[in-house]
Amino acid sequence: MQTYAVYWNDPEGERCAGRVSLGPSFAELNGGTSQGQLRSLRLGFEEIASVRYQHGRLHLWRRNAAPLRLGSADRPGALRELAERLKSQLAAAVA
């Protein structure tokens, strides 16, 4: 499973750093806060309404929850690559 180093804000607004992994039917965020609290969030592809890479951020709009914005802590171009892979897997899941 390919993983990417990212940062994001959790639902409480706290900044998290960790990784995102793409599974066959989900994207999973695992990481922690600056206070050492672990955070994990699994998003089924059916929960994701749309994906857009813009201004160096990956925007994930969810059907029934607030959108997520991810930033890269990985190599240059990794977030754009993640966006393309996620869009491709979402399209395949819908088909």
Model-derived regions, located:
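Acidic, Ser/Thr- and proline-rich intrinsically disordered linker/docking segments
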Residues: 1-17, 22, 28-30, 36-95
